[in-house]
From Swiss-Prot:
Source taxonomy: Eukaryota, Viridiplantae, Streptophyta, Embryophyta, Tracheophyta
Intracellular or extracellular location(s): Endoplasmic reticulum membrane
Active site: 465
Reactions performed catalytically: an acyl-CoA + a 1,2-diacyl-sn-glycerol = a triacyl-sn-glycerol + CoA
Major place of residence: endoplasmic reticulum
Chain segments carrying region Disordered: 1-104
Record keywords: Acyltransferase, Endoplasmic reticulum, Glycerol metabolism, Lipid biosynthesis, Lipid metabolism, Membrane, Transferase, Transmembrane, Transmembrane helix
Motif (FYXDWWN motif): 410-416
Annotated gene: DGAT1
One Gene Ontology term of the molecular function aspect: diacylglycerol O-acyltransferase activity
Name of the protein this chain belongs to: Diacylglycerol O-acyltransferase 1
Positions in coiled-coil regions: none
InterPro entries documented for this protein: Diacylglycerol_acylTrfase1, MBOAT_fam, Oat_ACAT_DAG_ARE
C-alpha cells in the first residue's frame, strides 16, 4: 500500500513509509472471533516522483466499518485529509480476494492510514481562521444552540414568575371574565352588527343600476359615498348612545371598519373595471394585456364571497384550494382556544393588577411612570404576540380553509423588520395591500409626491385606530391617532439610522424598543386611566 498525506501549507513531498518483506501483519479485531487476514506476499516498488513506496495487498473481511471510522477520524474542518491507499499488482492466493481487488474494490482505509495521517510532523495549523464569535464570523455561524438556550431560559424564568404571581395574588381569573352579563345584554350592538350586511346589498344594487345604465357615473359616486359613510357612522352612533362595555364596542367597530374597507375596495374596483371596459371597447387597450376579467360584469355571488373572505381587496375571482382539510381546521381551533386562554390569563393576572396600581403616566413622579411602563411592557408584548398569532395566523387561516381561499399571505416576517416602514409593510398584509391598491398608488397616479402619499396612508390608518379604540372607550383624546402619526418621524429616523450604520440588527432593536417596549404600554396606561376617570365622574 502507498499511503501519502500531503499537507496544504507545506511544499515538501508526502511521507513515504517503506515496510519490510513479510513484516506488515495488520490485525484488526471487531469481535472476539473475527480477525483480518493479511497477505505476506508484499512487493517493493519504486515511485518515480517521491522515491520509495510500499505496495501491499490487503484483504479485509469487514471494510465498511473501518472505512467509516477512518473517514470520521480524517475530517478536519469539513475537509478530509488526502489519504490514498492503493493496491497495485494484485496477488491471488487461491481465494477470491485477488478478484475483488482487480475489480476495483482495493481502495480501503485502515487504522494505519489514520496513524500516519496524524504524525507529529504533519502541520496542525494550515490556514487562517476566525473565532466563531468574532465580529467577522459571528453572522456566518449557526446559533441554533444559543436559540434553544434562550427558549429554555425564557420558559424557566416565566414559569418562576407565574408561580410567584399565583403565590402572591392567588387566582384572579373569574368565571366569564371576558363576557359579563352586561356585555351579553348589549342587544343594540348585536342588532347593529346583524344589520351591517344591508350596506353591501345597497352597494350591489347601485352597481347593477350603473351596469344597466340607469344612472350616471357622478350619481354612482355620490350613492357609494353615502353608503360607505353610513356603514361607518351608524355603529359609532349606536355605541355612543348605548354606553356599552368596551369589548362589545371594540368588536362592533372592528366589523364596521372591515365593512367600510371592503365597500371602498368594491366601489373602486368596479369603477376601474368600467373604465377599462370602455377603453377596451374603444380599442385603446387590448384585453389580453390586462390581468383582469373581461367583459365587465356584476355578480352578487362574487360580492357575497368577498364580504366573508379573509381579504380587503375585491376581485371577481380568487385562487381556490381543492378541498377543505377538516382535521387541520380542528387542530387550528384547538390552538385558537388555547392561545385565547393564555391571552386572558396574562391580562387578568398581570396587566390588570399593574394598571390598577399605577398612576397616570403624564402626571406624578416621572421615575414611577417609567417603572410602570417597563413593568407593563413584557406582559403587554406577550398579549400582543398572542393576539397576532390568534388572529392573523389561526383565525384567518381557519376562515381561508373553510372558504378554500388560496392566497394566505396574511403576514410576512415582520419580526425581522429593520425599520418602522418595513414593519408596516410586513405585519398586516390585508391592510397593506388595501392601502397600496386604493390609497398609495392612486395618489401617485394623480401627481401627489411619494412622501405625501405615505403621510396620507398613515393618516387614514390613524383615523381607524382612533375609531376602534376611542369610540368604545368614549374617550376622544386622540392618543391612538397621535401614536400612529408619530410613526411617520420614526420611519424617517429608522431609515436614516439604517442607511448610516448599514446594520440590520441595530434597526431591528430600535423597532422593537419604540414599538413594543415603549409605545404600546404607554397607550394602554393612558387609555386605562382616562377610562377610570370617566367612570368615576359618571358614577
Amino acid at each position: 500500500m502507498a499511503i501519502s498525506d500531503m499537507p496544504e501549507s507545506t511544499g515538501t513531498t508526502a511521507t513515504t513509509a517503506t515496510m519490510p518483506h513479510g513484516g506488515s501483519d495488520l490485525r484488526r479485531r471487531h469481535n472476539a472471533t473475527e480477525t483480518t487476514e493479511v497477505s505476506d506476499s508484499n512487493s517493493k516498488t519504486t515511485d518515480p516522483d517521491s522515491g520509495n513506496s510500499v505496495r501491499e495487498s490487503v484483504r479485509v473481511r469487514d471494510s465498511s466499518t473501518d472505512e467509516s471510522l477512518a473517514r470520521k477520524s480524517c475530517e478536519d474542518d469539513g475537509s478530509r485529509s488526502e489519504v490514498v491507499i492503493e493496491s497495485a499488482n494484485p496477488v491471488t492466493n487461491g481465494n477470491d480476494g485477488g478478484e475483488k481487488i482487480a475489480n476495483g474494490e482495493d481502495r480501503r482505509t485502515d487504522f494505519a492510514a489514520v496513524k500516519l495521517a496524524y504524525r507529529p510532523s504533519v502541520p496542525a495549523h494550515r490556514r487562517i481562521k476566525e473565532s466563531p464569535l468574532s465580529s467577522d464570523a459571528i453572522f456566518r455561524q449557526s446559533h441554533a444552540g444559543l436559540f434553544n438556550l434562550c427558549i429554555v431560559v425564557l420558559v424557566a424564568v416565566n414559569s418562576r414568575l407565574i408561580i410567584e404571581n399565583l403565590m402572591k395574588y392567588g387566582w384572579l381569573i373569574k368565571t366569564g371574565f371576558w363576557f359579563s352579563s352586561r356585555s351579553l345584554r348589549d342587544w343594540p350592538l348585536l342588532m347593529c352588527c346583524l344589520t351591517l350586511p344591508i350596506f353591501p346589498a345597497a352597494a350591489f344594487v347601485v352597481e347593477k343600476l350603473v351596469q344597466w345604465k340607469y344612472i350616471s357615473e357622478p350619481v354612482v359616486l355620490l350613492l357609494h359615498f353615502i353608503i360607505t359613510t353610513a356603514a361607518l357612522l351608524y355603529p359609532v352612533f349606536v355605541i355612543l348612545r348605548c354606553d356599552s362595555v368596551v369589548l362589545s364596542g371594540v368588536t362592533l367597530m372592528l366589523f364596521a371598519c372591515i365593512v367600510w374597507l371592503k365597500l371602498v375596495s368594491y366601489t373602486h374596483t368596479n369603477y376601474d373595471m368600467r373604465a377599462l371596459a370602455k377603453s377596451i371597447d374603444k380599442g385603446d387597450v387590448l384585453p389580453n394585456s390586462l390581468n383582469t376579467d373581461y367583459p365587465y360584469s356584476v355578480s352578487f355571488k362574487s360580492l357575497a364571497y368577498f364580504m366573508v373572505a379573509p381579504t380587503l381587496c375585491y376581485q371577481t375571482s380568487y385562487p381556490r384550494t381543492a378541498c377543505i382539510r377538516k382535521s387541520w381546521v380542528v387542530r387550528q381551533l384547538v390552538k385558537l382556544i388555547i392561545f385565547t386562554g393564555v391571552m386572558g390569563f396574562i391580562i387578568e393576572q398581570y396587566i390588570n393588577p399593574i394598571v390598577k396600581n399605577s398612576q397616570h403616566p403624564l402626571k406624578g413622579n416621572l421615575l414611577y411612570a417609567i417603572e410602570r411602563v417597563l413593568k407593563l411592557s413584557v406582559p403587554n408584548l406577550y398579549v400582543w404576540l398572542c393576539m397576532f398569532y390568534c388572529f392573523f395566523h389561526l383565525w384567518l387561516n381557519i376562515l381561508a380553509e373553510l372558504l378554500r381561499f388560496g392566497d394566505r399571505e396574511f403576514y410576512k416576517d415582520w419580526w425581522n423588520a429593520k425599520t418602522v416602514e418595513e414593519y408596516w409593510r410586513l405585519w398586516n398584509m390585508p391592510v397593506h395591500k388595501w392601502m397600496v391598491r386604493h390609497i398609495y398608488f392612486p395618489c401617485l397616479r394623480n401627481g401627489i409626491p411619494k412622501g405625501v402619499a405615505i403621510l396620507i396612508a398613515f393618516f387614514v390608518s390613524a383615523i381607524f385606530h382612533e375609531l376602534c379604540i376611542a369610540v368604545p372607550c368614549h374617550i376622544f383624546k386622540l392618543w391612538a391617532f397621535i401614536g400612529i402619526m408619530c410613526q411617520v418621524p420614526l420611519v424617517l429616523i429608522t431609515n436614516y439610522l439604517q442607511n448610516k450604520f448599514r446594520n440590520s440588527m441595530v434597526g431591528n432593536m430600535i423597532f422593537w424598543f419604540f414599538f413594543c417596549i415603549l409605545g404600546q404600554p404607554m397607550c394602554v396606561l393612558l387609555y386605562y386611566h382616562d377610562l377610570m376617570n370617566r367612570k368615576g365622574k359618571t358614577e
